[in-house]
Regions:
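Non-catalytic, well-ordered alpha-helical scaffold segments
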Residues: 1-4, 100-104, 108, 128, ...
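Long recognition/docking surfaces used for binding and targeting
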Residues: 3-114
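Non-catalytic alpha-helical coupling and interface elements of nucleotide-dependent molecular machines
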Residues: 11-12, 111, 115, 165, ...
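Glycine-rich, flexible loop segments associated with nucleotide phosphate handling
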Residues: 25-34, 102, 174-183, 328-329
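A generic structural motif
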Residues: 52, 212, 300-303
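Compact, aliphatic and Gly/Pro-tolerant "microcore" segments centered on a short helix or tight beta-hairpin
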Residues: 74-156, 160
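Conserved S-adenosyl-L-methionine
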Residues: 120-230, 238-240, 246, 250, ...
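A conserved structural/catalytic subdomain of Rossmann-like adenosyl-cofactor enzymes
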Residues: 224-225, 230-436
Length: 436
């Protein structure tokens, strides 16, 4: 409903003042007519795509409760929502240069109250600062073609478009080409698809090259014809099983890499467990990925990145269609302390040090500065390794006096505990049977 109202507000012939709660032409009908006009003016097609979008907005027209005047409000709930969204949200999207996924934030907030936040489907929306970090890590340029095969509410595509626009400056030809030809996505869930299309259309991406299809069923060779040089993805989490290994996160990763052009860069955010190869199928995916593509590095993220979900994520970066050299040096970074912190009743917020810590990460990633091994380990990698900083890291720092005292204290506490349990043989060289 929110995305539909925002589309209606973007129609030049639509006015909130025309919403009068009329029993003949309801507010919902007026809004849906405006949505239809806005989709046509943006050349959204084919007709099947436009019809699918309109079906997602049907509740605006069909809900009697939304279209009846409320005595307390003195207007229909639809008019109240429309006025609120115009004042608080629409102008921010339309007239400010922002990479913020406002509609995605609405979706996430509503779902958190519904008792069904999409986790049963593995849906975890990507925070805005992660979308922006992807653009930094992949060094997105105005000439790039971006593909997000699990685009959700289009957060990655919005961030990429914002970055490309900024780099393009006032060149309107380049900016128009970015919107028409250089942003592509797939989304399986029809409600998410509608939100994603709305997000792009409101930012003047008229044709919105997002398809409501299952990415895993697409032929990589055909997707490759889009010419994508950048891949960004937050795939569904924890859906893979022994019975259906195609749903593992690494399956999505391999399919994405196969769908990009040679030399393209891709970044994905997945659970840490995906990097360990904990099942035979996942190990097979890791081997196949290295056989055909190159792992550039893995960044361990803040454990609260997806606050309230309980997933410990990592960002993995790859180069497509270049087999991983055995002597390739990868970077494994511990970025858990990213400057973002959880505040009561608010959630994850940017701390005072976040910008500086992000800049340090990028300086290390691009080789502009060195970092101690506790932050970044540079190492070769194999398919049977755990692609995590914690796997490659060896604490080679000289212990401090406080570290030494703590270690001795821990040992003495352990020894005392064992003696009190009549297990002093552990420290005398005797056997457990001697006690008997």
């Amino acid at each position: 409903m929110v995305s539909g109202i925002l589309l209606a507000l973007d129609d030049q012939f639509f006015s909130v003042d025309n919403l009068k709660g009329d029993g003949i032409t309801t507010d919902g009908q007026l809004i849906c007519e405006a949505i239809q006009r806005r989709l046509k003016s943006s050349n959204v097609g084919p007709d099947a795509k436009r019809d699918k979008l309109m079906s997602e907005f049907a509740i605006i027209r069909t809900s009697a409760r939304l279209n009846e005047k409320d005595e307390k409000l003195g207007k229909t709930p639809l008019k109240f929502y429309t006025e609120f969204l115009k004042e608080r949200v629409f102008d921010s999207i339309k007239y400010k240069s922002s990479a913020e996924d406002f509609i995605g934030r609405f979706y996430g907030e509503f779902m958190s109250y519904s008792g069904g936040d999409g986790q049963s489907l593995g849906i975890i929306l990507t925070p805005a600062h992660i979308c922006e970090l992807f653009c930094d890590l992949l060094d997105v340029q105005p000439t790039d073609i971006v593909l997000d095969p699990c685009c959700g509410t289009a957060g990655f595509l919005v961030a990429a478009m914002h970055r490309m626009d900024y780099a393009a400056g006032d060149d309107q030809t380049v900016r128009k080409n970015i919107r028409k030809k250089q942003l592509h996505g797939f989304e399986l869930q029809s409600n998410m698809f509608a939100i994603a299309c709305t997000n792009m259309i409101l930012r003047e991406d008229g044709n919105s090259n997002i398809q409501c299809q299952d990415f895993l069923k697409q032929n990589p060779a055909l997707v490759q014809q889009k010419g994508a040089t950048i891949g960004m993805m937050n795939p569904p989490y924890s859906q893979g099983t022994k019975a259906d290994p195609s749903q593992y996160e690494l399956s999505f990763v391999e399919h994405l890499l196969d769908s990009l052009v040679k030399g393209a860069k891709a970044a994905v955010i997945v659970p840490q467990s995906s990097m360990t190869g904990k099942t035979k199928d996942e190990q097979h995916f890791k081997e196949s990925i290295m056989m055909h593509h190159t792992l550039e590095g893995v960044i361990t993220c803040n454990t609260d990145t997806f606050y309230g979900v309980g997933t410990n994520p990592v960002i993995a970066v790859f180069t497509a269609h270049e087999p991983h050299p055995t002597d390739k040096i990868c970077k494994f970074i511990d970025f858990r302390n990213d400057g973002y912190e959880v505040r009561a009743h608010i959630g994850l917020v940017e701390g005072d040090s976040a910008k500086d810590k992000k800049q340090h990460l990028l300086d290390v990633w691009f080789g502009r500065t060195e970092a101690p091994s506790k932050f970044c380990v540079e190492s070769t990698a194999q398919a049977d390794d755990e692609w995590l900083h914690s796997f490659y890291y060896f604490n080679d720092e000289i212990p401090t006096e406080a570290d030494f005292e703590k270690a001795i204290g821990d040992y003495l506490s352990f020894e005392f505990s064992m003696i009190m349990q009549n297990r002093e043989y552990l420290f005398t060289g005797g056997a457990a049977n001697d006690e008997a």
